[in-house]
Amino acid sequence: MPYISCLPGMPGVDNVIVIVPETNIAERSALGWKTDNLLADKRIQIVIAPKIEDVKALFAAYEKRDTWCMFLGISAFPPLHAWFKLSLKYNVKRGIITEPPFEYGHPLWQHAVRFFLKDLRYVSRISKIFVMGNRRLGYYRLWSRRWEVIPFMYCTEWRERQPFTLPVENGNRLRLLYVGSLTARKNVACLLKACMLLSPTERTRLSIGIVGDGEQRAMLETMARSELLCGVGVEFLGTQPMDRIPGIMQQYDALALPSLHDGWGAVGNEALTLGLYFLCSDHCGARMLLNRPGNGCTFKAGDADHLAACIRQTINHIEAIREGINERIAWSRKNISGHAVAQRFLSHLISDPQS
């Protein structure tokens, strides 16, 4: 996470130690994810796949200091859960960084039952829980008044937008991009259905780029050939390395994220930092980035009519949206850059009465 690299040297921070079970998970590494920058940062102590004795030694060394232990991915990686339980033996302050409950196919009550049976016992030992987005803050607050529930966000590596000139032939077209897997949960079909609801004239003012692959690609390609999408240019770009995504994004005006559920949706951060307008489903944590109206619009997940209205509004205001590129970049630098997120994160830790 880029904000981690910004923590060293900030007021109140003496040491930053990152303990991880592994680096560059295979499937993400193949897409271009890299941890080289973090590993090369000499201001941060990186501990990779440590033995339990090594973790014990770190807890013992820092328990008599003002130490926060933050756990991210505690349910996904068994070693992290073991390290969390080990931390309970030491005098350190604990916090959790988590995505909201994964509700796609798993209703909230199922998560509540699991939490009651497996996790409730630990609540009194956790001071703060940082939740991605603001959609399920109330769920976590119901469990206890002892911990502070804080809306949080992912952030991505900062990329500078490169100057470019809009092609003349696309001057009045909204160029709309999707980046992600082509699965039922990501719901790209809803995006195409929404475009089918546009008028023939509106469709001639729209082109769509789709980056990604998945089990629904063949179905989506069939939909794209429908007469109901006549006039819309739909281009399937396939899977692309992560380091090529910023360059692709800068060829578009807006990004759409139509997911039925996304814990966050970091592609939204990338889009805004490059100045794109962002159309986001209300079942994505990244909808929190749209509190500023000029950043984009939120639509009801799975509602093609509502998404069509967002697309129509974007088409009708294409000039203003293009004029707002620099404003979105400036807002992103101030609010969702690594430094901005690090400052927000640290302010919650330092403000703790026990700190």
Name these PLM-found stretches.
Residues 319-350:
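A charged, aromatic-enriched C-terminal amphipathic alpha-helix characteristic of glycosyltransferases
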Residues 119-120, 124-165, 171:
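Donor nucleotide-sugar binding/catalytic pocket of nucleotide-sugar-dependent glycosyltransferases
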Residues 260:
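Aromatic "clamp/platform" in nucleotide-sugar-dependent glycosyltransferases that forms part
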Residues 277-280:
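Short hydrophobic beta-strand element within catalytic cores of glycosyltransferases
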Residues 167-186, 192-195, 209:
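Conserved donor-binding/catalytic core segment of Leloir-type glycosyltransferases
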Residues 292-293, 297-304, 313-319:
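Conserved acidic donor-binding segment of nucleotide-sugar-dependent glycosyltransferases
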Residues 42-46, 221-240:
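Nucleotide-activated donor-binding/catalytic signature segment of Leloir-type glycosyltransferases, i.e.
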Residues 239-240, 247-252:
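Short alpha-helical donor nucleotide-sugar binding micro-motif in glycosyltransferases
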